[in-house]
């Protein structure tokens, strides 16, 4: 039987989501990234939890900026990507793809997802069908390719695509409404996308989150995850080349 974890999601900064993940059996709590130390500490107090570890997906300040203040307040350990260890404030343990990290009785696997940054990682809890993906992938979107190449980013998205379809993707930002506007320019006739967009509009009108995103739904609707489809490659002018098709879609989004 899989170990229960509790995921507490809350908004912080302009459009980030914060995540506290708690394993009741051990009483341990991890912070996934640290956009805003004060908000994280307040949310932990509200839940009567104490942050025991921080797990960073990448080095950007809206993901690791609160590390040192939270560490000072709680004495927590900080786990982060080995490839960005020099940029992760207060890092104690360096991890890379294939490593495992523990939260009490729950185990997460580290996945290398470079592209947005060169050392970007994700944390996948297979038994709990949850993946914390940082800025690698969003609902109907993916991160801008700041440090890596389009080929690198596509390989990262392929790793995410291989996760079980029922995996919930806990993305780091509420970008879904703007991503949806772009997605319909790529696949205007996609029926699943039209239904998803209607749901997104309703959720946002009610000021409710659209995250987490179900991988199964993303595979049917997220243009960035669909670059391996022959019809998508043809439409983007790169028949037989998924990486180039992805690059074309990403370039269009950058200019959108």
Swiss-Prot record:
Q: Which Cys-Cys disulfides exist here?
A: none
**CDD domains under this entry?**
hydroxyacylglutathione_hydrolase_MBL-fold
Family recorded in the similarity comment: Belongs to the metallo-beta-lactamase superfamily. Glyoxalase II family.
Query: A Pfam family for this UniProt protein?
Result: Lactamase_B
Its function, per the record, reads: Thiolesterase that catalyzes the hydrolysis of S-D-lactoyl-glutathione to form glutathione and D-lactic acid.
Catalyzed reaction equations = an S-(2-hydroxyacyl)glutathione + H2O = a 2-hydroxy carboxylate + glutathione + H(+)
The protein here is known as Hydroxyacylglutathione hydrolase
Q: Which organism is it from?
A: Hyphomonas neptunium (strain ATCC 15444)
- Molecular function as annotated in GO: hydroxyacylglutathione hydrolase activity; metal ion binding
């Amino acid at each position: 039987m899989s170990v229960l974890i509790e995921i507490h999601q809350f908004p912080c900064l302009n459009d980030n989501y914060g995540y506290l993940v708690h394993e009741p059996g051990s009483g341990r709590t991890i912070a996934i990234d640290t956009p805003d130390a004060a908000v994280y500490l307040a949310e932990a107090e509200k839940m009567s939890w104490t942050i025991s570890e921080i797990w960073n997906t990448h080095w950007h300040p809206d993901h690791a900026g609160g590390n040192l203040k939270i560490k000072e307040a709680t004495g927590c350990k900080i786990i982060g990507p080995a490839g960005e260890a020099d940029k992760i404030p207060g890092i104690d343990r360096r991890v890379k793809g294939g490593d495992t990290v523990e939260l009490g009785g729950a185990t997460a696997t580290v996945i290398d997802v470079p592209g947005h940054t060169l050392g970007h990682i994700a944390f996948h809890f297979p038994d709990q069908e949850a993946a914390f993906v940082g800025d690698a992938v969003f609902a109907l979107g993916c991160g801008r390719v700041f440090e890596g190449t389009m080929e690198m980013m596509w390989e990262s998205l392929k790793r995410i695509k291989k996760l079980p379809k029922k995996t919930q993707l806990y993305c780091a930002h509420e970008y879904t409404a703007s991503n949806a506007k772009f997605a319909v320019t790529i696949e205007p006739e996609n029926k699943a996308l039209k239904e998803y967009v209607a749901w997104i509009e309703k959720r946002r009108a009610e000021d409710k989150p659209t995250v987490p995103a179900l991988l199964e739904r993303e595979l049917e609707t997220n243009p960035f995850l669909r670059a391996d489809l022959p019809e998508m490659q043809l439409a983007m002018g790169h028949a037989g080349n998924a990486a180039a098709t992805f690059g074309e879609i990403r370039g269009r989004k950058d200019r959108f």
